[in-house]
């Protein structure tokens, strides 16, 4: 499976993306959902995702 990390500072948007995408059905594993850039960086270091989906207007 391809490991995905999601980062978005808007909780509603982040939760909707996490909830409504059939990650496993697309051969993906969601390894984390971060609420800010610092949290995303830590998750990238420890969880080693193949792809990071980032909100570019995030603190």
Q: What do these predicted regions represent?
A:
Residues 58:
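Receiver (REC) domain active-site loop signature in two-component systems and cognate sites
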Residues 8, 55:
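Active-site residues of response regulator receiver
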Residues 1-3:
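Non-catalytic signal-transmission and effector/linker regions of two-component phosphorelay proteins
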Residues 11-32:
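Two-component/phosphorelay signaling modules centered on CheY-like receiver
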Residues 33-42:
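Helix N-cap/capping motif at the beta->alpha junctions
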Residues 47-53:
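Active-site beta3 strand of CheY-like receiver
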Residues 5-6, 32:
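Short hydrophobic beta-strand elements that form part
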């Amino acid at each position: 499976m391809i490991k995905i990390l999601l980062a978005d500072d808007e909780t509603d948007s982040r939760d909707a993306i996490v909830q409504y995408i059939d990650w496993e059905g697309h051969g993906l594993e969601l390894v984390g959902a971060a609420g800010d850039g610092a949290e995303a960086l830590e998750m990238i270091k420890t969880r080693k995702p193949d792809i990071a989906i980032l909100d570019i207007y995030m603190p």
